[in-house]
Amino acid sequence: MYRILVINPGSSSTKVAVFEDEKKIAEKNVSHSVEELKKFKRSMDQEPLRRKAVEDFIDEVGYRIEDFSAIAARGGVLEPVPGGTYVVNEYMVDYLINRSPVDHVSNLAAVIGYKLGKPHGIPCFVVDPVSVDEMCDEARFSGIPEIERKSYSHALNIKAVLRKVSREMGKTPEEVKIVVAHLGSGISVCACKNGKIIDVNNANDEGPFSIERTGELPVGDVVKTAYSSKHSAAELKEEFTRKGGLLAYLGTKNLKKALDSMETSRKAKLVVEAMAYQIAKEIGGMCAVLGEKPDAIVITGGMAHEIRFVRMITDYIEKFGKVEVIPGELEMEALALGVLRVLRGEEKAMDYRSVVE
């Protein structure tokens, strides 16, 4: 039996769980108040606070760090890598702390796991990090040579959904062709073929607008705003990635509240319908990329809990293929199972430095 500690930081909470083989034994979502977090300039500065939350959880459930076979940490914004499970080492930790191109809370998980496990000889792994890059060559072109499209997505949940759906079909991930739409605070819509994410919108910069992100914007207007604005580049980026989308239009990040408002507000109705329209349009594009009818179109993520919203999307796309809805995220299970496959010898963990150099 293998006992695995799973660490998954979110923007305002830290999810921690204990798995024994495939079975989840304990789980906690530790909330962090705005007051706690606002004093930290960078996400990485939160590391001691988040690590203490993990240590407190381990104490609460009656374990010591030495009791674990391995630690599974959510993968951060690393250099582009193929999907899979990677050993966390000093090189990866240094990259996440000092060189990651995006200040993202997911960068904390591997650092926390490594610091907890190393003194006791407990290995730490990341599974399908945010920067999984398996895009086909055609998908990389942006329109100008100086800029290449980047693959930043909800790869962990996307890959977990791919495995789940293919297993239910009695096939391997390499044998199915599916489109996955992960709908959370950010949105990733991707085409999966031969077990790989061959195209995906960058969840920060492209695609549909979401709960708090603008998605793709008209280039001319972005340039005009940037040069006429009194805001710094960092402030503008925050406007686009944390203060845009549904929040900018309706003043709320609560999709249910926005859906309820549709009964009395024409503006709310139009905004929510526009978001569904843009998601459906992105899904249609990914169906085209596959080159043939997909085996399934999967809608997943937090927004998939709202059946009314899902229906708005499926009204557009159901003619493209079978639609399956998997609400929420499979991240904790995906992390644990990715590490379990390595511990059982079913899959080999990769060395991050060897892959990127």
Curated annotation (Swiss-Prot):
Its main location: cytoplasm. It comes from the Bacteria. It catalyses: butanoate + ATP = butanoyl phosphate + ADP. Its EC number is 2.7.2.7. Belongs to the acetokinase family. One of its GO terms (molecular function) is butyrate kinase activity. Keywords: ATP-binding, Cytoplasm, Kinase, Nucleotide-binding, Transferase. It holds the Pfam family Acetate_kinase. This is Probable butyrate kinase 1. GO terms for biological process: acetate metabolic process. It comes from Thermotoga maritima (strain ATCC 43589 / DSM 3109 / JCM 10099 / NBRC 100826 / MSB8). Coiled coil: none annotated. It is found in: Cytoplasm. InterPro entries: Aliphatic_acid_kin_short-chain, Aliphatic_acid_kinase_CS, ATPase_NBD, Butyrate_kin.
